[in-house]
Every structure is written in C-alpha cells, then in structure tokens.
C-alpha cells in the first residue's frame, strides 16, 4: 500500500538542537528545584549542572559587556553575594525559548506584562531578577565555556552540513528500520523502532570476551 512506504511515514528529519546557559541567581537559589521542573516541563534537556560561588572578579569577567555601566558594580556585588546554579540547556530554539520563559529583565515590569514568567514569580527588581539567560548563540557558547570550562562543545550541524550529516549517517539506518516496521507492523511501533535502532546502531562497539572493542578502521 502507498501508506506503507517508509519514506512517506514521516517528514524529512531536521536538526534543530540549540544550547543556552541558564543561571539561577542568589536571590532565587531556594527555588532551584521548582525552576528546574519548569525547565524540564518546557522541553529542555539539562546537559550540565553546577552549583558554585562566584568571586567578584569572576562576575566581572562573566558580565564584561556591562563594564562601565552604572549598574555594573551592583551587579557584580549581587552575583557574588551567594551561590548560583549554572545549567547548560538544550532544545530547539533554546535561546529564544529560555528568554521567553524568563520574561522581561525588570521583575516589576514582568509582573505587569508577563505575570507567569520566572522573573515575575521569583524576582523582586531589575537587579534581583532570579535568572539569567544567554542573549545570542555566540554568547551562549562563551558563557557555557565560562561556567563549564572542561566541557567540549561540539559545533551543531546547520543548513547543508546538517542535511549532509543526516543523509550520510542517519537516513540509511532509519530507512531500513522503517521498512522493517512496515513489514512487521508491531502493536507499539514507537517502542519497536526505538529498540530496533538501539540494536542496529552501526556505531555501537562490538563486544568480545566481555570487553567492548571498536571495529578497526
């Protein structure tokens, strides 16, 4: 049947993953669990998490783009006044989505215009506004490296590079799996396909005498 054509079962896969940095500031540290729940319910994956106490010098480096502004001394003093929680987040349109969840910079304005956002719920003013988020893709990359200096941030395939990656490494295996799915017609196709992909991952290491060994190149 035409509907059984595996190539027509789903649209062409695309890569949308984006990363951003979220900071839970000292004034909202007691709300960490609640904020993390909101993050996860919003479709984010928490790639890394770290609780730390920043020094005034570290705060100055992190907020270097604010240097020379009137609020800069107050910002660095506040951010070094207590522990913060740094979170490396990932999902499609992560930067824009996290900014929307945070709401306006001013918690006072946020309570008037976006009463359900994090800054309206957990912040008190422009300075003590509960959370921070990366403004741009380049800022996210820099801030994640700042908070997680030992992490390796692989470049995300985009545009033609993403299409090439999918056509070379993903689509061939996926097409075989979908073909088998159409033949077998399991009761739970999603679970069946997930298990099939796990068992037929071409990059899965071979196991020999209890030890995992990679195939020779």
Swiss-Prot record:
Entry's SUPFAM superfamilies? Nucleoside diphosphate kinase, NDK
Q: Enumerate the UniProt keywords alphabetically.
A: Cell projection, Developmental protein, Hydrolase
- Keyword flag Hydrolase: yes
Q: Which GO terms describe its cellular component?
A: cilium
Q: Where is this region: NDK?
A: 18-151
The record's listing under SMART domains reads:
NDK
State where the protein is found: Cell projection, Cilium
Q: Fill in the domain comment.
A: Does not possess all residues considered to be crucial for the NDPK activity.
Q: What does this protein do?
A: Functions as part of axonemal radial spoke complexes that play an important part in the motility of sperm and cilia. Does not seem to have nucleoside diphosphate kinase (NDPK) activity. Exhibits a 3'-5' exonuclease activity with a preference for single-stranded DNA, suggesting roles in DNA proofreading and repair.
The record's similarity note reads: Belongs to the NDK family.
The name of this protein is Nucleoside diphosphate kinase homolog 5
Question: Which species is this record about?
Answer: Danio rerio (Zebrafish)
- Top-level taxonomy: Eukaryota, Metazoa, Chordata, Craniata, Vertebrata
């Amino acid at each position: 049947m035409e509907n059984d054509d595996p190539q027509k079962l789903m649209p062409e896969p695309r890569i949308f993953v984006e990363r951003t940095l979220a900071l839970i500031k000292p004034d909202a540290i007691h709300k960490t669990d609640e904020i993390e729940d909101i993050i996860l319910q919003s479709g984010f994956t928490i790639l890394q998490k770290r609780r730390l106490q920043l020094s005034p010098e570290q705060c100055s480096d992190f907020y270097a783009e604010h240097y020379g502004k009137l609020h800069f001394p107050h910002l660095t003093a506040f951010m070094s006044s207590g522990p913060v929680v740094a979170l490396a987040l990932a999902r499609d349109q992560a930067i824009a989505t996290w900014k929307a969840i945070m709401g306006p910079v001013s918690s006072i304005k946020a309570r008037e215009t976006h009463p359900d956002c994090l800054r309206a719920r957990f912040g008190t003013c422009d300075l003590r506004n509960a959370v921070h988020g990366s403004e741009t893709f380049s800022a996210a990359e820099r801030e994640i490296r700042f908070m997680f200096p030992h992490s390796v941030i692989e470049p995300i395939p985009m545009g033609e590079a993403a299409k090439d990656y999918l056509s070379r490494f993903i689509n061939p295996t996926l097409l075989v799996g979908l073909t088998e799915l159409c033949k077998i017609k399991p009761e739970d196709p999603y679970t069946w396909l997930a298990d099939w992909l796990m068992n037929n991952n071409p990059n899965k290491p071979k196991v020999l005498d209890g030890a995992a060994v990679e195939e020779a190149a």
